[in-house]
Structure formats: C-alpha cells, structure tokens
C-alpha cells in the first residue's frame, strides 16, 4: 500500500489536531483513512455550459483510482467561465481572468487543507491552463485529466462543430442563408456535453497536456461521452499516487524541454493562438525562461501535419479514431522534433512512452500527414514583430490561405463597434480592421474576437480582409487575423496611434507587421495621445487590470513580474 503523506500529518495527526479529524469523521473518515495519503480531486464543474457539465461524475471515477492505489480522495470544485457563451458580450472580459483565478482558488483550497497530492479535471478553455499553472505553482504530485470533447454534429453528410454556428451568423447577416437554415445549424452543431469539437483552445490545451507530460498518454482525445474517459479517470487516480511514490512533482516535469515539446506540438497541429499565452504562463509558474523568441525560433522549423478544424476539415473525434495525440507526438518524435528526455507524470520520459506506443491499425484518412510531406509546409502560428507590435503579436497562419496582406486601416475602439460595422456591411475587401483597447489591461481581460472574425468569414471576406487587435482570438478563428499585439493600446502601444486610412502590411512568411507611416508622424501622434481612464474603479476587473502583465509575458497576474 502506498503511504506518501507529504503534508497531511501536520493537519490531521496528533492530539492537537483532534478537532481537525472530527470534521472529516463527519463525512465518513475512519481511523484507517487518517493513515492514508489525502488526495484532492479538483473538478472544474459547472452547469453553466456543456464543457464542464460532466466533470463531477468523472471526479468520482478518479476517487476510485485513488482508493485502489491506497489513498483517500476528496473532491473540491473551482470556477468555470464558458468562453463560447460569453463571446461578444461583457462576460468575455472574465474569460482570461478566470484562468488565473482558477490557479488561485486551487492554491487556496489545497494549501489550506494539507492535501498531499491531487488530480485536476478540466474542460473549457481556461480551466485547463489554470489547473496546469496551479500544478507547477504548488509542486505537489499531480496529474492533469481532460474532461473530453463533445461529439460533432451532422447535417446530412456535413460534419458540424460550434465553429459553424458562429460563421453562419455572418452568412445570415450577409443574406447568404435563411433564418431557418441558421436555426438548423444552431440545433445540430453541439449534440452532447463536452468541449468545442475542433482543434480550438480546449482541445489544443488537452493535446498539449500530453506533450507537456502532465497527463496520461492518450487521455486527451476520447470524447466526453466515451467509456474510455471514465477509464482514464480511474487510471489518473492511480497514477497520481504512483507519481507521489516516485517523488515526481510538476516542476520536475515542466522543464524547458517540456515547454519546447508543447510548442512543437502546437505549431504542428495549427492549434489555438491562446496556447501561446497559456504556455508562457505555465512556464512563468514553473520558473522556466521561455519567451516569444523561443516560440518564433521553433515555429520556423515545424510544418503543420494535422488537418483539424479550423485549419482543416476534421474534428477531435476523428483524431481519436486514429489514435489521438500519441499518433501526432510519435510522428514528431520519429522526425527528431521532440526532446525525448523530458520526464512525464507517468514516471518515464516522453521518448520511452512513445517508443512503446503503437498506433491502431486504421488509416489516417487525411487527418494526419507526415513531417516530410506535411498538410502545410509552414507552422500553424507565426510570431510577428514590427513597429506596430514591438513586443510581438501572433498570427494563426495555419488557418489562413494567404500569408501576406496589405491594406488600409479601419479603426474601432472595441469589439462591439467593429461587429456593428461588419453587420452593416461597412467592411470592404482590402480593409485592415483594427480593434484596440481590448488588451489585458484595456478591456480589461483581453477578450476573444470570434464574433467579429466569424462574421467576417461568414460574409465571405475571410481572405479579403485582415484583422489586427490587442485582444485575443478564439481557437475557432480562421482567416488573416493578428492578435496579442504588444504593447496594447491602453498602455500606449503603437496600436493606439493608428488612424483610419493608415496602410498596414502583414507578412506571415517573414514575421513582420508594419504601420506604414513615417517615424516622425508616429512620434507626433504619441505626444498627443493620452491614456484612457480605467473602465472599472472596483471589483475583480479593476484588480485584474492593476495586476495583469502584457500578452508577450503570458498576461499573468503578478507582483512583481519575475
């Protein structure tokens, strides 16, 4: 029997802790239970949306695995903000904020109660990095487990994901489909609980949890409705006590090499640009120096090998059918693109796990490609720099057919203004839509622009218009879109100085973004610029705006920034 009681004796052993034991006896603890490791089961659970609807049930299966391995599991919740439901509303300001809040709530709960080890179950976009940040912050034995993707919907022979609902709004506004057709997409696109079905932010972070070594190999792809999801829950409960017995903690796993492997995997799958922010934040919590320069260098050597939405036509359940994330990782490993000595929570290096893993005997069906003959010859994401983004920006080139664009700026001080312009037909081919004051401090919360980007694509302007913002993009975004512009407008970044009619050049091949005005004119505008007053004087959003760092630092909340 495993007996790894790292911290709990200080809470529950001895005469002086008699009252503490009394509390737990009230929920069924026995004398024997107090001799076992106390293992937290963190469930990011909520009925406010489908993504985390089932995680409480999965937590009970995790407890079974913990019990089998000789521990006692205790379930604790954390908050969930459903990104999709909040898209284009004031609620989206709470999305990125929730990532750091989740990490904070886990720290508070588990440090306050003397937990020896824990398993974190995530679902919707920010629950996953929030849990992983807490894993390395607490540095207790821990395993991450994904709640799983929703099943794709079907309209005849057409496979649907939630991406279709956002884009068909644009099609409807452009007069391309009827209201009845839009309603049909609404009804069919999201048929089960689980997360958004394409390689959007949730599924991106799930795959990266395997690449980082924080989750069991193969655990990312089974749908939320699959019986294998419950089996992985039990296995994760057993695995965390094995990790404790071996002395493996997240900071031994999340090294530079692990972040490197995650970055390679992100670029090879054309995953969500949000993952750049989240990997920077996880690296920060782990004390690992990893910057946009590292991402830039890696991105120039890794092609896209996965045809997953929005870069391709397939959903996460299609990837699961051919072996899931391990099939991607093994291709990258065999091509020499991964650092195989990175340790995992399973107690072995990722290289050893991948050597042993064998893919199922099913064809890849155009879902995956080889590194030698990739789906796209370039990376899924490019880091951009230039006089419009001195500290960097990101462009999801894997989901765009054009890598270069030049046009005249149409400037909007917020997403709502921009969406009204798209809906009114004011955006024309050749425009560069600039949405500013939507950064970490300015919004605050760096909201996603999916409502606008999807409306642009749905209107048939996806390759005829570019969008530049100091905000973020949903993982479902496609087209010529540049986000995370740093410094943001609210702190006086050059994006605050752009005027209607200015020409902007975007080059996804070389990684440059240029505001084509003389430097003297830029300086003249800078002298005339005044910072806007804070949007909030109290409450959570005001606290966040005061603490949050810029996008190139992962938008972490920190005093001081290490």
Curated annotation (Swiss-Prot):
UniProt pathway: Amino-acid biosynthesis; L-isoleucine biosynthesis; L-isoleucine from 2-oxobutanoate: step 3/4; Amino-acid biosynthesis; L-valine biosynthesis; L-valine from pyruvate: step 3/4
Assigned keywords, A-Z: 2Fe-2S, Amino-acid biosynthesis, Branched-chain amino acid biosynthesis, Iron, Iron-sulfur, Lyase, Magnesium, Metal-binding
N6-carboxylysine PTM sites in chain numbering: 126
EC nos: 4.2.1.9
Gene Ontology MF terms in the entry: 2 iron, 2 sulfur cluster binding; dihydroxy-acid dehydratase activity; magnesium ion binding
Domain of life assignment: Archaea
Single Gene Ontology BP annotation: L-valine biosynthetic process
Cofactor note: Binds 1 [2Fe-2S] cluster per subunit. This cluster acts as a Lewis acid cofactor.
InterPro entries attached to this UniProt entry: DHAD_IlvD/Edd, Dihydro-acid_dehy_C, DihydroxyA_deHydtase, DiOHA_6PGluconate_deHydtase_CS, ILV_EDD_C, ILV_EDD_N, IlvD/EDD_N
Quaternary structure and interacting proteins, as annotated: Homodimer.
NCBIfam families: ilvD, PRK00911.1
PANTHER family found in the cross-reference section: DIHYDROXY-ACID DEHYDRATASE DAD, DIHYDROXY-ACID DEHYDRATASE, MITOCHONDRIAL
Function: Functions in the biosynthesis of branched-chain amino acids. Catalyzes the dehydration of (2R,3R)-2,3-dihydroxy-3-methylpentanoate (2,3-dihydroxy-3-methylvalerate) into 2-oxo-3-methylpentanoate (2-oxo-3-methylvalerate) and of (2R)-2,3-dihydroxy-3-methylbutanoate (2,3-dihydroxyisovalerate) into 2-oxo-3-methylbutanoate (2-oxoisovalerate), the penultimate precursor to L-isoleucine and L-valine, respectively.
Entry protein name: Dihydroxy-acid dehydratase
Gene: ilvD
